[in-house]
């Protein structure tokens, strides 16, 4: 007796077809799984055996061979439990094999027969929809699967309910799509007193999707400013929301099947390892930079990160994706992020403060700032000093302009960019390539002369030159200008200041 059930294997954000095949033959009873299974898949034998026993079914005393085809594709994860169990049930005649042929199945089994959540259901649903099949998944993830469009989803809480549905004796209700609840409001720019230059840089960064580095003493408000950024960014468009939710799904972080509408804001600790930041691990998983896709990656205390970890961000910041290579697989995750970083000018943080003079200056500052490589700094569009706030500033009334007003200007600038690049590929000025910059961001004659003189005086690299053009284009968009002018270039150049080096 033989039976087959369709399921998937995850490679990055791609779900590949896998066929679970079960063969029952005579011989000394044993249960074998072949087809490059990992430890979690191999252990599914005991979970499946116990789950079937919990609903009153015992495995036949035969040689049970489970093959996961194609055999050369690595199989990882616990979501193979359910398709293996269904394949066994079809092989012993407990359910109709023909009805199962119209579905893709994913889900982890408990020992009592319950079907519990497993990562990647949204990807499996999209794959099933593209294959003109339905999806069998855990009840807790039915809403997540229903976002894949017109798709027959059977979201069953346990094996008994699933068998009853397949036999037609008791149907499982179709799950409705559930959109994410609006998140609780974060800090407002109205709470930040002073720091007008930093607020302006934050607005420019939000409007164009530019990378930002804030440098200043402890307690100046760098982290608070970064936390205000999500409040002025526009919400995700439907296609972007699906991209972000797919990354969250494969990482197992899409709670309650709720599609993300708010742009991600990830803030890993400075002790984070390279796999934690860019992805990897024994079972390849998206890192923080991919979980921040189309959102913000905030690195506080930037020089405290390990230098190899920081340098691993250089390629993703340029390409918008990160590739993780293993001996038997190669996985690519999206990583189009807006990098926001904060750092102190030196280890003690008080360089240049006459009241709290650094005892090791200037050597302390040079050593501390040298922890961040020049190529990484060159990829940051906006460098802004955030000075300490005086007691007089703290006693002032709150500023009249808060996040809502800034968000409106940012949204207007983003709409200008969306109209400009419609059909060309980029979504923001930060994503524009050289051809797009030549077409849309070439300054007028005074602006070109200023940029040429500054490029020579500041020794701008080709990358730095293009980043100044991108920031200039964003400043012009915020000002409602059709053409990039000298004033826009001048402001953009003022943000190219880098930390002093010996």
List each language-model region with its residue ranges:
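Solvent-exposed alpha-helical segments within well-ordered globular domains of core cellular machineries
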Residues: 3, 18, 42-54, 84-90, ...
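P-loop NTPase nucleotide-binding/switch module
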Residues: 167-204, 208, 238-289
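Basic, amphipathic alpha-helical bundle interface domains used for macromolecular binding and assembly
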Residues: 34, 40-45, 60, 67-77, ...
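Conserved catalytic network of the ASCE P-loop NTPase/AAA+ motor domain
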Residues: 25, 56-59, 96-98, 128-130, ...
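Walker B catalytic acidic pair
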Residues: 294, 300-301, 312
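Peripheral, non-AAA+ core regions of ATP-driven protein-machinery
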Residues: 1-213, 217-223, 325, 465, ...
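Walker A/P-loop
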Residues: 214-254
């Amino acid at each position: 007796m033989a039976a087959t059930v369709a399921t998937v294997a995850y490679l990055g954000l791609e779900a590949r077809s896998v066929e679970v095949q079960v063969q029952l033959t005579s011989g000394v009873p044993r249960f074998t799984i072949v087809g490059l299974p990992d430890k979690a898949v191999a252990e599914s034998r005991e979970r499946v055996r116990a789950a079937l026993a919990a609903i009153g079914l015992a495995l036949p005393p035969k040689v049970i061979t489970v093959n996961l085809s194609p055999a050369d594709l690595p199989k990882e994860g616990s979501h193979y439990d359910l398709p293996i169990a269904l394949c066994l049930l079809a092989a012993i005649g407990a359910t109709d094999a023909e009805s199962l042929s119209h579905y893709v199945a994913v889900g982890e089994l408990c020992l009592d027969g319950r079907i519990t959540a497993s990562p990647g259901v949204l990807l499996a649903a999209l794959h099933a929809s593209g294959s003109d099949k339905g999806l069998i998944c855990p009840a807790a993830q039915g809403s997540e699967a229903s976002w894949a469009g017109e798709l027959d989803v059977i979201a069953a809480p346990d094996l008994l309910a699933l068998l009853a549905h397949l036999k037609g004796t008791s149907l499982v209700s179709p799950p409705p799509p559930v959109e994410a609840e609006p998140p609780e409001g974060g800090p407002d720019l109205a709470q930040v007193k002073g720091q007008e230059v930093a607020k302006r840089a934050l607005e420019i960064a939000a409007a164009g999707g530019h990378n930002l580095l804030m440098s200043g003493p402890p307690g100046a408000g760098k982290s608070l400013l970064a936390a205000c950024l999500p409040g002025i960014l526009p919400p995700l468009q439907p296609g972007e929301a699906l991209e972000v939710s797919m990354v969250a799904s494969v990482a197992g972080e899409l709670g309650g099947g709720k599609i993300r509408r708010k742009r991600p804001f990830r803030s890993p600790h400075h002790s984070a390892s390279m796999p934690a930041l860019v992805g990897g691990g024994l079972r390849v998983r998206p890192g923080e930079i991919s979980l921040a896709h189309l959102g913000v990656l905030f690195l506080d205390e930037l020089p405290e990160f390990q230098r190899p970890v920081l340098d691993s961000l250089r390629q993703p910041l340029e390409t918008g994706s990160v590739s993780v290579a293993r001996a038997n697989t190669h996985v690519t995750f999206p990583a189009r992020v807006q990098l926001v970083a904060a750092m102190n000018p030196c280890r003690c943080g008080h360089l240049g403060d006459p009241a709290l003079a650094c005892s090791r200056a200037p050597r302390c500052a040079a050593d501390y700032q040298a922890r961040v490589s020049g190529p990484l700094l060159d990829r940051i569009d906006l460098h802004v000093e955030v000075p300490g706030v005086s007691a007089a500033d703290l006693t002032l009334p709150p500023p009249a302009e808060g996040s809502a007003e800034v968000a409106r200007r940012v949204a207007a600038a983003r709409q200008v960019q969306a109209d400009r690049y419609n059909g060309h590929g980029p979504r923001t000025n930060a994503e524009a390539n050289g051809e797009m910059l030549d077409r849309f961001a070439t300054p007028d004659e005074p602006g070109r002369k200023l940029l040429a003189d500054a490029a020579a005086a500041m020794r701008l690299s080709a990358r730095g030159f293009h980043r100044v053009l991108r920031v200039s284009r964003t400043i012009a968009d915020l000002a409602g200008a059709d053409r990039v002018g000298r004033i826009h270039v001048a402001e953009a150049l003022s943000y190219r200041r880098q930390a002093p080096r010996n």
